[in-house]
UniProtKB/Swiss-Prot annotation:
This protein's record includes keyword Signal: no
InterPro entries the UniProt entry points to: ATPase_NBD, Chaperone_DnaK, Heat_shock_70_CS, HSP70_C_sf, HSP70_peptide-bd_sf, Hsp_70_fam
Function: Acts as a chaperone.
Induction section of the entry: By stress conditions e.g. heat shock.
Superkingdom of origin organism: Bacteria
Region (Disordered): 515-537, 575-622
Keywords on record: ATP-binding, Chaperone, Nucleotide-binding, Phosphoprotein, Stress response
Name of the protein described by the UniProt record: Chaperone protein DnaK
MF-aspect GO terms: ATP binding; ATP-dependent protein folding chaperone; unfolded protein binding
Length: 622
């Protein structure tokens, strides 16, 4: 059985890990780094870049460089978070089947397809590191991800060619990575602030059991929002000074984004930093430069409202768990944004105790995911994860009210039934609208999907008995069924989430991803062949020059023709590996023939040399 990899598919960076020989370890990417930027770029040459190479060229290619795609994963285009993303991100967000998608060079891509390209790179890096094929994976999601977002994440894994064994919550994975499952029974809080999402989870650990007591968060709050505060400040200051709005210039905006991200990182260890962006734009008077000094105090004043929101969520979740803060033994800090000093200070103040920062916050979630993979595979025994559903689930009933069937905080997997009836006399069908959220009315919650149960026999309202069953699996993904008890007629819907992707569409995307993988392989082989050909041309031309008059006219003509043919092929940017290698073979053969001829000439002894050799007597000399 092949190894199971654990993947933290992050908003800003992603990480992959594996459990081997009793421990979980992070797998470095081909560039030698432990984390890979969750960035995908489409170049004018038709190449698709992923990770560091994509991030490096973002400034010169902002509209076709995709980052923070996790922020629109599983979102409908009409949701507020989608509208916010459209205003913030430089690439073109559009819709497909009502769900968020992006448009690049006239082609529509879903967030699942973009995320799949990041996952494919992580998969390939893992295969190169382990020296074997990898298919099985455990992928983490923020604890507060809804059903649509979880399903979309699983689809991304499928498109990438992975068999997703489990979708688990990031804080739960972090608890495993810290080894907290092995300690005495105690209550802990995992505070997870990443690039685009925030979660706080209260867990109880002990006797090899990790049980989630309560969870909460914001799927649209993270380090990106800290960056955006800096971007807004820098753009506003520049506009006041020059009258130019940098937000209307996508290339300038991308430079601002990178500068803001770097400033945020520097202010984690320094009290002030300088932002210098020469030639950021130009007007009739000439080029303009942006230069600004930002102090840590100024930065903290920009983000204190966001940090306060996370502290408010801590109080809410600890209360949901039925605990007092004094009962919490450890506070585990997860996610790159927890490096911000203000975040650490406020969380420490909220609990009145030191924070647990013993594991790299960028890697801890992937490490935990690999441990969960080992649990599923059977390499790690006697560890039990008891996760919960982050939001209540129910259906729409008379008056547009949401009737909850599964309350938030219910341990999963779980299955619950509830019986309903008709609202009108002789009603022959009912529509089941499946909802997720905490509000009283359907319109204020997220609709996950709906289906009809038809063929109900005519009867006065309130008489038919319709049993609705909600079944949540270990991934937190929901299946809903409805059955008329009188006739036994039933209808089932596996909630596919907001992605709106059918099984056929997902399969087509899998094939498309494989096709691109094959295209990328061929392109890489052609580049390698081109490099070898350039070396061969240089080597043969050098040899011809050095040998000069020693080369016969016939040999020279043959070699020159083979050289010209190869050079002509290399001028074609689309030349395949096979075409290049065919011309290389011809050149190699004629140049080898030349070498043989030259060698034979050197070997042929002259008459004088032969005569001298005949006079030589073999003897030992004292």
């Amino acid at each position: 059985m092949s190894k199971v990899i654990g993947i933290d598919l992050g908003t800003t960076n992603s990480c992959v890990s594996v459990y081997e020989r009793g421990e979980s370890k992070v797998i470095p990417n081909k560039e030698g780094k432990n984390t890979t930027p969750s960035v995908v770029a489409f170049t004018d040459k038709g190449e698709i870049l992923v990770g560091d190479s994509a991030k490096r060229q973002a400034v010169t290619n902002p509209e076709k460089t995709i980052y923070s795609i996790k922020r629109i994963m599983g979102l409908m285009i009409n949701e507020d978070a989608a509208k916010e993303a459209k205003n913030r991100l430089p690439y073109h967000i559009t819709e497909r089947n009502g769900a968020c998608a992006i448009e690049i060079a006239g082609k529509i891509y879903t967030p699942q397809e973009i995320s799949a390209k990041v996952l494919m790179k992580l998969k390939e890096d893992a295969e190169a590191f382990l020296g074997e094929k990898v298919e099985d994976a455990v992928i983490t999601v923020p604890a507060y991800f809804n059903d649509a977002q979880r399903k979309a994440t699983k689809e991304a894994g499928t498109i990438a060619g992975l068999n997703v064994l489990r979708i688990i919550n990031e804080p739960t994975a972090a608890a495993l990575a810290y080894g907290l499952d092995k300690k005495e029974s105690e209550k802990i809080v995992v505070y997870d602030l990443g690039g685009g999402t925030f979660d706080v989870t209260v867990l109880e650990t002990g006797d090899n059991v990790v049980e989630v007591l309560a969870t909460g968060g914001n799927a649209f709050l993270g380090g990106d929002d800290f960056d955006n505060k800096l971007i807004d400040y820098l753009a506003s200051e520049f506009k006041d000074e020059t009258g130019i709005d940098l937000k209307n210039d996508v290339m300038a905006l991308q430079r601002l984004k990178e500068a803001a991200e770097n400033a945020k990182k520097e202010l984690s260890s320094a009290n002030e930093t300088n932002v210098n962006l020469p030639f950021i734009t130009a007007d009739a008077s000439g080029p303009k430069h942006l230069t600004k000094t930002i102090t840590r105090a100024k930065f903290e004043s920009m983000i204190d409202g966001l940090v306060a929101e996370t502290i408010s969520k801590i109080n809410e979740v600890v209360k949901d768990a039925g605990l007092d803060k004094s009962e919490v033994k450890e506070i585990v800090m997860v996610g790159g944004s927890t490096r911000v000093p203000l975040v650490q200070e406020e969380v420490k103040k909220a609990f009145g105790k030191d924070l647990n920062k013993s594991v790299n916050p960028d890697e801890v979630v992937a490490i935990g995911a690999a441990i969960q993979g080992a649990v599923i595979k059977g390499d790690v025994k006697d560890v039990l994860l008891l996760d919960v559903t982050p939001l209540s689930l129910g259906i729409e009933t008379l008056g547009g009210v949401m009737t909850k069937i599964i309350e938030k905080g219910t341990t999963i997997p779980t299955k619950k039934e509830q019986t309903f009836s008709t609202a009108e006399d002789n009603q022959s069908a009912v529509t089941i609208n499946v909802l997720q959220g905490e509000r009283e009315f359907s319109r204020d919650n997220k609709s996950l999907g709906n289906f009809n149960l038809e063929g109900i026999p005519p009867a006065p309202r309130g008489m038919p008995q319709i049993e609705v069953t909600f079944d949540i699996d270990a991934n937190g993904i929901l299946t809903v069924s409805a059955k008329d008890k009188a006739t036994g007629k039933a209808q089932e819907i596996k909630i596919t989430g907001s992605s709106g992707l059918s099984e056929e569409e997902i399969n087509n995307m899998v094939k498309d991803a494989e096709l691109h993988k094959e295209e990328d392989r061929k392109r890489k082989e052609a580049v390698e062949a081109r490099n070898s050909a350039d070396s061969l041309v240089h080597q043969v031309e050098k040899s011809l020059s050095e040998l000069g008059e020693k080369v016969s006219d016939e040999d020279k003509a043959n070699i020159q023709k083979a050289l010209d043919d190869l050079k002509e092929t290399l001028k074609n940017a689309n030349a395949s590996k096979e075409e290049i290698e065919s011309k290389m073979k011809t050149l190699s053969e004629v140049s080898h023939k030349l070498a043989e001829n030259m060698y034979k000439k050197d070997e042929k002894p002259s008459d004088d040399k032969k005569k001298k050799d005949d006079d030589v007597i073999d003897a030992e000399v004292e």
